[in-house]
Amino acid sequence: MSNQYEVLGKAPVAGDLKKLTSSDIHLTIKNLNAGYGKMEILHNFDLFVSKAQSLCLIGPNGAGKSTILHSIYGFTNIFSGKIEINGKEITNLTPAEKLKSVGIAYILQDNSVFPDMTVEENLLMGGFIKDKSEESFAEAEKVLQKYERLRNRRGQPAKVLSGGERRLLEISRALVMKPSVLLVDEPSIGLEPKYIDMVFEILRDLQQNE
């Protein structure tokens, strides 16, 4: 089906998108029109994503991939349409409210580690939405035990990490946070192959933990 739409140059309709998901739909976007300022970039956009499903947005620069992520998280103006998590409408919630109430986390394309905080402290920042700090410490320890590169520098400031190690740290925070929806913009950009493998291993771990 994907090849058919690629050849014809047509976008799939909502009914066809639903066929690609299970009956357990977690994220729903219906007839979304969104953009920046007064400029509308997304037009009547639909999306359905099941629980524990991984979805990759592919397209040329300027196609609107980041705008879709920004709209889900709350960085754009929503002109019409709605976004739901498990049937709960979250269209007009702020990013902080989406993180707290329904567990939407966003890993930006640009580096977002805290350079003067230690590697371990950066990991623990991923658990600030949890009620029990003990659980956050336990999850952070699991990450450190699994990834030697982070474990060996757990007490050092994050600014000493290489670009690949910083990206690994950013995405590892999601293992501590345990979001219901994780948005990742360009997860492997600028990374060496060894780090790309680690990043996608983390994303697989998150998917299997659902």
What are these language model-derived features?
Residues 27, 42-44:
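Conserved structural motif at the start of ABC-family nucleotide-binding domains
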Residues 58-60:
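The feature captures the beta-strand-to-loop junction immediately N-terminal to the Walker
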Residues 73:
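Helix-to-loop junction immediately C-terminal to a conserved catalytic motif
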Residues 77, 89-105, 110, 133-134, ...:
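ABC ATPase NBD coupling module
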Residues 81-90, 100-101, 135-140, 145:
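Conserved ABC transporter NBD signature motif
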Residues 157-161:
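Conserved ABC ATPase signature
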Residues 174-175:
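ABC ATPase C-loop
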